Amino acid sequence: MRTNYCGQLNLSHVGQEVTLCGWVHRRRDLGGLIFIDLRDREGVVQVFFDPDHQDAFRQASELRNEFCVQVTGTVRARPESQRNSEMPTGEIEVFGHGLTLINRAEPLPLDFNQTNSEENRLKYRYLDLRRPEMAARLKTRAKITAFVRRFMDNHGFLDIETPMLTKATPEGARDYLVPSRVHKGKFYALPQSPQLFKQLLMMSGFDRYYQIVKCFRDEDLRADRQPEFTQIDVETSFMSAGQVREIMEALARALWMEIKGVDLGDFPVMTFAEAMRRFGSDKPDLRNPLELVDVADLVKSVDFKVFSGPANDARGRVIALRVPGGATLTRKNIDEYGQFVGIYGAKGLAWMKVNDRAAGMDGVQSPIAKFLNAEVLEGILARSGAQSGDIIFFGADSAKVATDAMGALRLKVGRDLQLTDESRWAPLWVVDFPMFEEDGEGGLAAMHHPFTSPRDISPEALKANPVGAIANAYDMVMNGYEVGGGSVRIHSGAMQSAVFDILGINEQEQREKFGFLLDALKFGTPPHAGLAFGLDRLVMLLTGTENIRDVIAFPKTTAAACPLTDAPSRANPAALQELSIAVCAKQGSDA
């Protein structure tokens, strides 16, 4: 039906007859001539009709926005005075002499020239995707996946599919369960990741695997999460953590060059401990120049319990955050920041304006200055690197609360005061994560997942001191986003059982849930390691949007619902009966 895409026409096509298909983006009737902007997935081109071609002109007079049409015409160069430098096709136009109306469009429930509600955009997603900026994002996504496949193929990786219907295993989030009709009372789980299957593939001898795969997690509602998402999943055998990082870094660098024309350079490597100490985050945004500074040793003896309490507590932390030029902040600004850190559990936000660095006590303005002697004050100013015109914020609490609150404040202040250089890219690797973290119920949870190998420790030593163990894990971070995470995997049955024991998974439960893995580990398992990129987040970064739903064709809302199809929906009672499922209605529900 078409010979060319609208957005691909240029001066090289002048004189050629073309047939185009698409939608009327805009129509203008100038009396003697009718102009339309015709749009398809590749862009927009101007088409005009004159009265000499009566049938086409008559039909063009009836066109309205979003009518679907076919146009045949001749490509002409626009007069110099009428060229539009803001359009890729602005040097040419199409003189239309044939027009077929394929389908009319009713008045649209979306206004392409206005901001539409998120709910409406998702309900009429097929219309929302017609917008050029949305089409461009999905085209970039397709370009990214095609590039990744070429790269992985060129590096000897095999694209191998793994099951979608599998066994429920604890991987950190709730599973989506699928009932079995054949096996009454039993359920499959949709995979949270292909983790165990890709490890089994390593045991099968496929030493370089990858897959671009859907994953499912029934998580609590968050704006940046989707119940179904896509991973670029990678696993290797007989490679060290450094070798895996080298290949994955090469992929990221090649991808950024392909899509953005940007050379990311070598990625710095930072330990988890350093990232938390300096930036208050395990995914630090290095475009932001602000850093956290520990001052607990300076304030242990001050007559200010807010500082001295955490300073003398082994589980406490006292942090200073210097903000260059921040002395211009108003008291209202400071109070708003105090409310902000409260979100992270902080009980308040102490502050100090440095009006004259050389004047010592007389040069600062702060409600806490009266609690600090000249020596302590000078120590804080010197360690933080304070200059005249700066402000210093303080966080003092348990190490977790102080670190989380001041890390978040660092990001917010960096954005608010335009200190973060958003014109550049700042990648890095974060390594040496703790193996375990407290689960809030007196036990331990795996910081990554239960199949991550600890570094340089025996199963016996791990069980004796699990809190001190370091995981052989690594995350790729870009501009404050974790874009990929991976680790060296456990390839010893004894070590895997030790980790399960530490996590409170008893021997019977180990056999029930992971017996197939423990059995596989008995038969010459190779050392293996891998990584998974979040494709949706990669596309989000590379297309410059801040909403992950903008890079998914048919996403869910933050409530994990689909306004377009009205999913999830109630099941047919006959289907439920066949599956031996009874729905128990909660009191007050309409079930």
Swiss-Prot record:
GO terms for biological process: aspartyl-tRNA aminoacylation. It is an enzyme of class 6 (ligase). It catalyses: tRNA(Asp) + L-aspartate + ATP = L-aspartyl-tRNA(Asp) + AMP + diphosphate. It is found in: Cytoplasm. Residues 195-198 are annotated as: Aspartate. L-aspartate binds at residues 171, 217, 448, 489. Its main location: cytoplasm. Pfam families: GAD, tRNA-synt_2, tRNA_anti-codon. Its EC number is 6.1.1.12. Keywords: Aminoacyl-tRNA synthetase, ATP-binding, Cytoplasm, Ligase, Nucleotide-binding, Protein biosynthesis. ATP binds at residues 217-219, 226, 482, 534-537. One of its GO terms (molecular function) is aspartate-tRNA ligase activity. GO terms for cellular component: cytoplasm. Coiled coil: none annotated. Catalyzes the attachment of L-aspartate to tRNA(Asp) in a two-step reaction: L-aspartate is first activated by ATP to form Asp-AMP and then transferred to the acceptor end of tRNA(Asp). NCBIfam families: aspS_bact, PRK00476.1. Belongs to the class-II aminoacyl-tRNA synthetase family. Type 1 subfamily. Homodimer. This is Aspartate--tRNA ligase.
